[in-house]
Amino acid sequence: MEHRLHARFTVEGVHGRMTLASQVDILNMSISGVAIKVDRALRVGGEYALNLQLQNRVITVHALVVWCVLGEIRKGAHGEAMPVYSAGMKFTDVLSPKLMELISFIDRHKIVEEHRLGGLRVHIDAPGKAMLEVPQTYRVKVISLSGMLIEMEEGLELDRVCPMEFSLKEGGDAIRFTGRIVYCVEAVDQDTRKHEIGVAFEDIDLEQKKHLADFIDSISK
């Protein structure tokens, strides 16, 4: 964010959310739920969208996290420690046509059937065929017409692109856009681990950009 083409303004009370996609390894699955490995801790009781690749199409099912534990620590490409979590999730919306597609997915990729007290589970072979949508919240600290500086718990890799939104006032309409990560640094605030992240607005329609411009004009006076 070195070449600033637009004036930047500090803001208070502006919060937003983004959706991060994580590829997951499916360990086993049943009609009622799934066990996965994922690169981040999931909140027990939280509901997430799981995108399953079925041949040339994707179905999305929603699932509730029942348990989540740290499974192992792997080494990243640069030798950094990368935690891997195991989680159990219960499907919440399978009473629909998605149920038959899910049954087909299980049957297509199963390796071993495993009979448990809670019902039949199968181990499946489907590498790279499932993505988990993980919602994250953030606080906007500084904003301009071209981007913003936000604060959130998790750090993000540079050049990552993700769908984002924020509301300029409580109860107001959300401004939705695609953001690209251009800066990320860890900041310690009263022993709380947070990250300051620079985001460039990559894809925002003209009407929403006008709302943003009007807001910036109102706080610049």
Predicted features by range, described:
Residues M1-K221:
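Structured alpha-helical
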